Amino acid sequence: MSNKGQLLQDPFLNLLRKEHVPVSIYLVNGIKLQGHIESFDQYVVLLRNTVTQMVYKHAISTVVPGRPVNFHATEAQDSN
């Protein structure tokens, strides 16, 4: 994954993690997972609900916060 992709991805996922925002993660096969982001790295997201699941990023289509979040893409890019 290029560094450019992580300029948006990392700050967004980190905001969701730090603020304990519930998320719905849709996989490329259509499956919907729900929980809180516990951790993430370049390749995986740890999603916690009743159990912790390791979800590979290449399998993720969409991450949808369960409530509004104050995230500005331009600020995330400017800070890096």
Curated annotation (Swiss-Prot):
Q: Which PROSITE patterns match?
A: SM (PS52002)
Q: Pfam families attached here?
A: Hfq
Q: Does the keyword RNA-binding apply?
A: yes
Which Gene Ontology cellular-component terms appear in the entry? cytosol
Q: Which GO terms describe its molecular function?
A: RNA binding
According to its UniProt entry, the protein's GO biological process terms are:
regulation of DNA-templated transcription; regulation of RNA stability; regulation of translation, ncRNA-mediated
**Which key words are in the record?**
RNA-binding, Stress response
Protein family membership:
Belongs to the Hfq family.
**Subunit organization:** Homohexamer.
Biological role: RNA chaperone that binds small regulatory RNA (sRNAs) and mRNAs to facilitate mRNA translational regulation in response to envelope stress, environmental stress and changes in metabolite concentrations. Also binds with high specificity to tRNAs.
Name of the protein in question: RNA-binding protein Hfq
